[in-house]
């Protein structure tokens, strides 16, 4: 209730005159409009005190509570909507309102002026609302002009500095394919869809006292059991921005570099407790968290291993540059910089945990994120995994779209995993009942065409795939020269790595009876084409000999991270003989170092006897333990030292021969008989 209505209720405008129940009149206009009108016009019901004001008859004082709402009701055709008037009347006073209306009808001439006066009042209200709208529109236009001016200023600043906010690339194909959705980075989103929100959030009870409000992050959710976060000296810098792409790099402060040196010493000791001691002083050192996570995983402590990886991701996300975006697909991190590799490995380990946890949709989003950081080089070779995650997440449309957009410039059909996963995606898509019949038949035909091309290009995949699925092939297939055992043996070693990697990871996707029957039909079609002398068969054989001579380093790195036994066993000797560190597997040969680890002087007497013996075989061995030259060229890292050591051992063993043992004399025959 307004103050003006209270004054009228108390009768202050008419002095101390008593008020009757049917003699109250109230103006629906403001005081300013009342002053502009000049002389007042009389309504049909006069005030007992003198000249009356135009208004609305009120028979109950409690109607004043809702009388102010009448001013905001719309006016249509000069009349106010009837719902507002009815709402202003209390339910218990409907009879009074009706009696008041009947009394007003019997007043004669006074009642004839009521409609015209009401239309006049509604016209005044309409004019007032138009004025208010004009004022609002003028202020809105002014604010929009101000925002446009601000945008122009920001654009000029960005053009002058050359630092543009990372946005979509000019070629939108990669942007759309590698676009990451924030909500799919949270595994709870997928688990809620499977089990319901109550099952996932049932144990999470909010605490009202001593609540901690951590920084909002997308990759992980901080836990109350973690140490208090303080900046560990890790930051991110924007290197350059060109062609719609922004290149970033992590940086280590001097304090973080000291912690990194201590970490390398702890790794060389081969004692996990030394890493635990380091984490007590530096609880958010990323490499220590990742290395200790591997140690916990080897000891079957999966929960602790996953928690350590999440803490490493949280530490790196808190160090993000303000312009670094996880979802745009236009931010790049160079894997040649050692500071950036920790982020790659942390994302990969988190993706592996999510897949084992039963969240393939979330793992697919992490896979796209890793691929978007450096899609051209693909240092972790995520193209060997993304098809598997898309099939497990039943996101067949995404896999087909990725194949269609990247086949022209990446030759995805030359990878066995894409050659077999894409037709499988088409076939599974054709099995969906919600698709129209024409689309189902089209997808089925496309699937059959692609699987026949895959079997022609990679015939050595069929028999190992059937064996992994516990399916016995027909005699006509297993005994044929094209799909027989010779097909698997004759393929190059690099191709064997890719085939073993795909079968060890995705063979269970082919176990469905409908899938096996469809595969069997197309196998017989391929055999008919081979027997008919199709020239495509010979062309594929020549292509296999040329393309798969040696696998690149990123594929070897991916095989090591996958930990698939069949694929690891197929690695070449030059990779298996190298020392592989969990925090940096197979570093690039063209590494860009921002700082060099200082060489340490260790007393010779404190070393292991066998290690000292092998070290003494090196040509640059000295008893005093002299310091090598400073700088990147002179200071050799641990991996290079181990490589030299292994080469020296191999050379020694190659030149080491045992003399032929002399034949035993006849006199010693009785002595040897005692061992029988």
UniProtKB/Swiss-Prot annotation:
It comes from Homo sapiens. The gene is TCF25. Component of the ribosome quality control complex (RQC), a ribosome-associated complex that mediates ubiquitination and extraction of incompletely synthesized nascent chains for proteasomal degradation. In the RQC complex, required to promote formation of 'Lys-48'-linked polyubiquitin chains during ubiquitination of incompletely synthesized proteins by LTN1. May negatively regulate the calcineurin-NFAT signaling cascade by suppressing the activity of transcription factor NFATC4. May play a role in cell death control. Pfam families: Tcf25. Residues 123-136 have a biased composition (Basic residues). InterPro entries: TCF25/Rqc1, TPR-like_helical_dom_sf. SUPFAM superfamilies: TPR-like. The keyword Transmembrane does not apply. This is Ribosome quality control complex subunit TCF25. GO terms for cellular component: cytosol; nucleus; RQC complex. The lineage of its organism: Eukaryota, Metazoa, Chordata, Craniata, Vertebrata. Component of the ribosome quality control complex (RQC), composed of the E3 ubiquitin ligase LTN1, TCF25 and NEMF associated with the 60S ribosomal subunit. Interacts (via C-terminus) with NFATC4; the interaction leads to suppresson of NFATC4 transcription factor activity and is reduced following stimulation with angiotensin-2. Interacts with XIAP.
